[in-house]
Amino acid sequence: MKFIVKPHPEVFVKSDSVRKRFIRILESNLRSIIQRETKGVEVINRRDHIEVTGLSDEYRDVTLSVLTQTPGIHHVLEVKQSGFKDMHDIFEQCLEMNREVIEGKTFCVRVKRRGNHDFTSIELERYVGGGLNQSVESASVRLKNPEVTVKFEVANDKLNLIIARHKGLGGFPLGTQEDVLSLISGGFDSGVSSYLHIKRGSKVHYLFFNLGGPAHEIGVKQVSHFLWKKYGSSAKVKFISVDFDPVVAEILEKVDDGQMGVILKRMFMRAGGMVAEKFGIEGLVTGEALGQVSSQTLTNLRHIDNVTDSLILRPLINWDKEDIIDLAREIGTEDFAKTMPEYCGVISKKPTVKAVKEKLEKEEAKFDFSVLEQAVYNARVMDIRDIEKESQEQAPEVEMVSELGSDVVVLDIRSAEEEDEKPLELDGVEVTHIPFFKLATKFGDLDQSKEYLLYCERGVMSRLQALLLIENGYKNVKVYRP
């Protein structure tokens, strides 16, 4: 198993010292994750690229998943590496790998070469291409728009025959940009905006203003943990939860209805600024898009921004909702967002779309700011890696089962893609697939005389979903951990 990792082109327009630092950080990030997820896989910095090698293909899929989900990588070449004697030896190796691929098709040969050789890249392309054309009678050369492009690299004394090219995430290596604090609600927008800053190289910490109780917090923890685990697990980041119920109660009691939405957002930014300052974070990230709701007009956004000195970053400011949902689907947060409640939208019955500074200040003069300060002071800060541990501690009443009786039903709560990739088949036991995001609404329709065991790959989602069901009064739920 061998992969050649090509950093994003923007890395190479940096100065020499910055480029070297970025690639060292990318190397460190990859090594951190790969050593945790695999055994015997090496990560080697080759200055202008990174090589990832293993003695066998045992961890091929896991390694490729890490490489294509790590920020800072443009593409990944899956290669077969060997030595060579001369151009004819290279041709013979290319023929062995590509004979069946080019049969009955048009093709061309493209070579990248580094090092000192007695041939040029063009000479090698012509030699190998001519040899393939003569050796495979049904194939024909076409230099423009061929059906097959035979690609390989010659690096000094090594020949890299390209098996496949995999698209990377792009962006900058995680940790090359300054940290940001994402105001996450668990919906489509905040998940996508968090992802975009991870992709751009920032360690994203998560700040959650809890308006919906334990169930809402569990849901937001799930999506935050998912984003960190899939795209940023080389970084140590924080999940911070602030109970905003007292703040909302104060607004509802003392603030004019039309100003409530903007004032709530101003309170979010004030609290976010306090938390960011405490942890030395320069920027707040939100999922706001221009004109999407009443508080997101230019006038209202300006009034919202003015309450904090923190830089407010809005990567989705000009995005259409449809495009946001499409990206959420692509990165894997759509299923979380579908069932995530939006509590902020009910705050005003007749919200203003063009708030006036004097009116806002008049209404905020009625507000007891000690309530906000106390809420921030009582914020709960945790390492995002502890969410998995907490799910076990929060649900001690959730029984873990490893052996199955014939009278139980196993609910596979993984996504459809995960279930298709690794179907759960158990002899003599009924297995039903209900994705986790449908479980809350579908579970009540099941036969409640039966006992249900929830299953997912790592046991994190199944524990959290079991806790939610138990909180909703269901007692016939356990977790299956084979």
Swiss-Prot record:
SUPFAM superfamilies: Adenine nucleotide alpha hydrolases-like (SSF52402), Rhodanese/Cell cycle control phosphatase (SSF52821), THUMP domain-like (SSF143437). Residues 61-165 form the THUMP domain. Keywords: ATP-binding, Cytoplasm, Disulfide bond, Nucleotide-binding, Redox-active center, RNA-binding, Thiamine biosynthesis, Transferase, tRNA-binding. It is found in: Cytoplasm. Residues 404-482 form the Rhodanese domain. One of its GO terms (biological process) is tRNA 4-thiouridine biosynthesis. GO terms for cellular component: cytosol. The active site is at 456 (cysteine persulfide intermediate). Its EC number is 2.8.1.4. ATP binds at residues 183-184, 265, 287, 296. Disulfide bonds join 344-456. CDD domains: PPase_ThiI, RHOD, THUMP_ThiI. Pathway: Cofactor biosynthesis; thiamine diphosphate biosynthesis. It catalyses: [ThiI sulfur-carrier protein]-S-sulfanyl-L-cysteine + a uridine in tRNA + 2 reduced [2Fe-2S]-[ferredoxin] + ATP + H(+) = [ThiI sulfur-carrier protein]-L-cysteine + a 4-thiouridine in tRNA + 2 oxidized [2Fe-2S]-[ferredoxin] + AMP + diphosphate; [ThiS sulfur-carrier protein]-C-terminal Gly-Gly-AMP + S-sulfanyl-L-cysteinyl-[cysteine desulfurase] + AH2 = [ThiS sulfur-carrier protein]-C-terminal-Gly-aminoethanethioate + L-cysteinyl-[cysteine desulfurase] + A + AMP + 2 H(+). GO terms for molecular function: ATP binding; CCA tRNA nucleotidyltransferase activity; tRNA binding; tRNA-uracil-4 sulfurtransferase activity. Catalyzes the ATP-dependent transfer of a sulfur to tRNA to produce 4-thiouridine in position 8 of tRNAs, which functions as a near-UV photosensor. Also catalyzes the transfer of sulfur to the sulfur carrier protein ThiS, forming ThiS-thiocarboxylate. This is a step in the synthesis of thiazole, in the thiamine biosynthesis pathway. The sulfur is donated as persulfide by IscS. NCBIfam families: ThiI_C_thiazole (TIGR04271), tRNA uracil 4-sulfurtransferase ThiI (TIGR00342). Belongs to the ThiI family. This is tRNA sulfurtransferase. It comes from Aliivibrio fischeri (strain MJ11) (Vibrio fischeri).
